[in-house]
UniProtKB/Swiss-Prot annotation:
PANTHER family: L-RHAMNOSE ISOMERASE. HAMAP family: RhaA. Coiled coil: none annotated. It comes from Yersinia pseudotuberculosis serotype O:1b (strain IP 31758). Binds 1 Mn(2+) ion per subunit. Its EC number is 5.3.1.14. It holds the Pfam family RhaA. This is L-rhamnose isomerase.
Length: 418
């Protein structure tokens, strides 16, 4: 460490020790908490299936910042820079549309070999991989239905796509030695008020059971399901509602995915974590930033991001919660978006680990809510930034906003040529 950072580090450790926090233990724990970065920030959820395809499914990437990745080589290059600017363990989250093939491949025919380059790259960079079937931006999803489709042939196509995706996910886990979390999200819903809300959910229930019927090694693959309140073009009815997937995950013992933008604007997923964990074995979190709707803005170090991290740490959910990011902003430098959002998630985890939780919990149990509030607020002023800077330097990444210099240089030399 540089002298100034080392001095600040030593003083900060003393301050935290005075309130009963072991900084070294906190950092050891932080190094066991990977954040899964989402590949789709790098190309606005375009994928490699059809570079000229239109994004559908009630989601939208807004903006036209230059330098968007156009192929796997460019995307991996962009990711490598982002990874080099973020301290601590990371993973990469892939969608099925990021396959690599010299010839077109039907989505229900995708195989592990179509992702072999991703696996080789992940091994090189010591990353785990997570996966998602892509049930959108496809002719057979154009009417707004996939796994709940009334046409059995179309429904079967999407069942087969999800089944193929599970095998790819298991391949990731087997090859990389860390389980791949595969999340199923579908856009199925209606723009206006439906007459029959039940039948699509019955079809979805049956389809999901068929999707997960093949037994896969849990050391390689973990199933997750994700709800949503609404999407563009599906404002009045979403088949995969929160109640549907909460019931499904609890009854089938899959992981439940909570996306920060998939609920009513007055709801927060930090308040849902402790309840859901009573009924499901695992949670997958999609940390995002909804602005008035599921806008998927870049994650900030705001109150909700901090609350999400605090829930994980306070309840020792390290082995049951998988932390992923889900945002896509095309109005700013896409590499910077990754770096900002992921560093903020890690800052939130660090701050949560530096909280004197046991002391605060004892005050709460004694009913001393005055002291609880006072200490909770005072600990916000403790010098966590000095610990963060030391952690960054230990991991050979820029300590402060100097990481932006590397992004600007790359933008000038590489992105501007695209």
């Amino acid at each position: 460490m540089t002298n100034s950072i080392e001095q600040a580090w030593d003083l900060a450790k003393q301050r935290f020790a005075a309130v009963g926090v072991d900084v070294d233990a906190a950092l050891t724990r932080l190094d066991t908490l990977p954040v899964s970065m989402h590949c789709w920030q790098g190309d606005d959820v375009t994928g490699f299936e059809d570079p000229d395809g239109v994004l559908t499914g009630g989601i939208q990437a807004t903006g036209n910042y230059p330098g968007k990745a156009r192929n796997a080589t460019e995307l991996r290059s962009d990711l490598e820079l982002a990874l080099a600017l973020i301290p601590g363990p990371k993973r990469l989250n892939l969608h099925a549309i990021y396959l690599e093939s010299d010839t077109p491949v039907a989505r229900n025919k995708i195989e592990p070999r179509h992702f072999s380059h991703w696996v080789a790259w992940a091994k090189k960079h010591q990353l785990g991989l997570d996966f998602n079937p892509s049930c959108f931006s496809h002719p057979l999803s154009a009417d707004g239905f996939t796994l709940s489709h009334a046409d059995p042939e179309i429904r079967q196509f999407w069942i087969e796509h999800c089944q193929a995706s599970r095998r790819i996910s298991a391949y990731f886990g087997e090859q990389l030695g860390t389980p791949s979390v595969m999340n199923i999200w579908i856009p199925d819903g209606m723009k206006d008020t439906p007459i029959d809300r039940l039948a699509p959910r019955q079809r979805l229930l049956s389809a999901l059971d068929e999707v997960i019927s093949e037994k896969l090694n849990p050391a390689h693959h973990i199933d997750a399901v994700e709800s949503k309140l609404f999407g563009i073009g599906a404002e009045s009815y979403t088949v995969g509602s929160n109640e549907f997937y909460m019931g499904y995950a609890a009854s089938r013992q899959t992981a439940l995915c909570l996306d920060a933008g998939h609920f009513h604007p007055t709801e927060v997923i930090s308040d849902k974590i402790s309840s859901a964990m009573l009924y499901v074995p695992r949670l997958l979190l999609h940390v995002s930033r909804p602005v008035r709707w599921d806008s998927d803005h870049v994650v900030l170090l705001d109150d909700e991001t901090q609350a999400i991290a605090s829930e994980i740490i306070r309840h020792n959910l390290f082995d049951r919660v998988h932390i992923g990011l889900d945002f896509f902003d095309a109005s700013i430098n896409r590499i910077a978006a990754w770096v900002i959002g992921t560093r903020n998630m890690k800052k939130a985890l660090l701050r949560a680990l530096l909280e004197p939780t046991d002391r605060l919990r004892q005050l709460e149990l004694r009913g001393d809510y005055t002291a609880r509030l006072a200490l909770l607020e005072e600990q916000k002023s403790l010098p966590w930034q000095a610990i963060w800077e030391g952690y960054c330097q230990r991991n050979d990444v820029p300590v402060d906003a100097r990481w932006l210099d590397a992004v600007r240089e790359y933008e000038q030399q590489i992105l501007s040529q695209r």
